[in-house]
A protein has these predicted regions:
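A conserved active-site cap/scaffold subdomain adjacent to cofactor or substrate pockets
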Residues: 97-126
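Active-site mouth loops of central-metabolism enzymes
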Residues: 85-96, 152
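Glycine-rich, histidine-containing beta strand-loop boundary motifs that form or position
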Residues: 12-16, 115
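Acidic/polar active-site rim loop that often engages polyanionic ligands
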Residues: 15-26
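An alpha-helical appendage that flanks or caps ligand/catalytic pockets
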Residues: 29-82, 120-193
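Structural preference for beta-strand elements that scaffold enzyme active sites
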Residues: 7-11, 88-90, 110-112, 142-148
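Acidic (Asp/Glu)-rich catalytic clusters
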Residues: 1-7, 102-106, 130, 134-140
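Extracellular/periplasmic catalytic domains that process cell-envelope and extracellular macromolecules
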Residues: 2-3, 81-84
Length: 193
């Protein structure tokens, strides 16, 4: 945020890749809960001062620099963000009726609905975001909701048709076949129905 002089947007997600969770040894844990715990600590670091001493109840992440802090050389100090009180935080959303979007609204994070979702599923995110904002006495602003879309502009119709539909080796077809395989393996193919 400091390098970008306030033009930084923090993109976050609890992550849906089971392989990442397995590699980290958290395959059977509630990754949404771990994500919430991590975000709480990040926000506390940005709002706090050294030595931080962050120790939230029911949160696995504890942060302190009390023993190693050496202010004369900058040890134990985490810089404040350029944007105050913090940069904009945008969270990706895939699941229809995602409960995570409620938490985004409650924390004033902004949702980004995935590019491959059918419109009927992306539309379910708005109601949950508005519910989250209402939970903290605020009104949701549609300008805070982003919907990703994949757009390809070709030199002519034939190229566009080949890229999007006819050529089985096109990057577009490859991307969606990979997404579909991942969703089927994770039993989440409902996003395509």
């Amino acid at each position: 945020d400091n390098l970008a002089r306030g033009r930084f947007i923090l993109g976050v997600s609890p992550g849906a890749l089971r392989s990442d969770a397995e590699a980290l040894g958290i395959l059977d844990e509630d990754r949404n809960q771990i994500f919430a715990e991590a975000i709480d600590v990040i926000l506390a670091i940005w709002a706090g001062e050294t030595p931080y001493d962050i120790d939230f109840e029911n949160n696995r992440f504890k942060v302190t620099t009390a023993e190693t802090r050496y202010l004369d050389v900058g040890y134990g100090i985490m810089p404040k963000t350029f944007q105050q009180p913090r940069p904009e935080i945008v969270g990706t959303v895939v699941a229809p009726f995602s409960r995570g979007v409620i938490a985004m609204g409650e924390r004033d994070f902004h949702p980004l609905s995935a590019n491959f979702l059918l419109p009927k599923w992306a539309a379910t995110h708005w109601g949950n975001y508005a519910e989250g904002k209402a939970n903290v006495g605020e009104v949701a602003d549609p300008a805070d909701w982003r919907i990703a879309r994949t757009i390809f502009v070709a030199d002519d119709d034939a190229t566009a048709k080949a890229y999007g539909k006819d050529d089985t080796n096109s990057p577009y077809r490859f991307y969606y076949s990979q997404i579909l395989k991942k969703m089927i393996r994770g039993n989440r193919q409902g996003v395509f129905k």
